[in-house]
A protein has these predicted regions:
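Feature recognizes metal-dependent phosphohydrolase scaffolds
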Residues: 1-317
Length: 317
């Protein structure tokens, strides 16, 4: 929300108090212009508002990278150690090593990072995070909307012979379904989607004292940015690189092979069969896939088997 200037949604819409973050950011980064943390798509902010926004943006981003690193450490099975980039920084020299190559960093001011323990939250960061968590947990309207999504939504839906889903069905380059190890068993296709659906519900509905709840919550984070997540569909999320590295080759996020393969009718038929659907009247309705109309791309693909719904209503697109 901060990155795209949408704090009004949190503050006015859901009643979540951003003052603790603003106060912390102004104090912690008072001598830091935070220039690489500009607010996207916002031109009507007063200069002081933009400065505060940049400081808040950096403050929560640093906390994000620390907490994400901790999640990855807890789950070696995610195979995301290469994304713990705070540990790949040489804080004395101001460089970060990514996939074996050193890059100079665009920002080297990290007053809250201990180079010996870069993932450790400071006392102030920990208190701020706890305060923000409590604000989110006690927002009645937010939970009303979340419950609506859980009641009416699903990871996929079969309806009138059609298959609807968001993102992709993870695939390998040879067209076979990409697997994920879940509780010691490799799951693919529909079995993987069903398992993910179960974890999504556990993350919200299990009681706070159930040890499976925290694991499911961590898995929800993996779904947002993990390489084998059907709702992400890329090899990595390069947020860190966008902030700190000028070399745009590090910004690239490679799409899952699904996105090319699904343009073939026979691949779509195989996906439909995986979900118990077949015949001329069956189609895939695929959400969250931008359609580049200006480049001549069409939303109907695979000889009419695949309908792609663009994310064009988003300001970011």
């Amino acid at each position: 929300s901060i990155r795209y200037g949408n704090l009004d949604i949190l503050e006015d819409g859901y009643g979540i108090n951003m003052l603790p973050l603003a106060t912390y950011a102004m104090e912690t980064y008072k001598d830091d212009p935070c220039t690489v943390f500009g607010i996207k798509g916002v031109s009507d902010y007063h200069s002081l508002e933009q400065e505060l926004g940049r400081k808040m943006h950096k403050a929560i981003a640093v906390i994000q990278f620390k907490v994400e690193g901790q999640i990855i450490k807890r789950h070696p099975g995610y195979k995301m150690d290469d994304r713990i980039l705070l540990e790949a920084v040489d804080y004395n020299r101001g460089v970060v090593t990514i996939e074996g190559t050193e890059y100079p960093m665009l920002d080297t001011m990290f007053p809250t990072i201990d180079p010996k323990h870069p993932l450790r939250l400071t006392k102030e960061e920990d208190e701020l995070l706890h305060t923000l968590i409590m604000s989110f947990r006690h927002s009645g309207l937010l939970h009303k909307h979340i419950r609506f999504l859980y009641t009416n939504g699903a990871l996929y839906k079969c309806h009138n012979g059609n298959l609807l889903y968001h993102g992709c069905i993870p695939m390998r380059p040879d067209g076979s379904f990409e697997g994920m190890i879940c509780n010691g068993e490799e799951l693919t296709g529909r079995a993987l989607m069903d398992y993910i659906g179960e974890q999504i519900h556990k993350a919200y509905f299990l009681s706070e004292d159930d040890p499976d709840k925290n694991s499911a919550r961590d898995f929800m984070w993996y779904l947002w940015c993990g390489a084998k997540s059907p709702v992400f569909g890329k090899d990595k999320m390069t947020t860190f690189e966008h902030y700190f590295v000028a070399d745009k080759t590090t910004h690239r996020e490679r799409l899952n092979p699904y996105y090319k393969l699904s343009q073939q009718e026979e691949v779509c038929d195989r996906i439909l069969q995986e979900f118990g659907l077949s015949g001329e009247g069956s189609h895939i309705i695929n959400g969250h896939v931008p359609v580049k109309i200006k480049d001549g791309e069409m939303p109907v693909k695979a000889n009419g088997k695949l309908f792609v719904i663009d994310g064009g209503l988003s300001k970011a697109y």
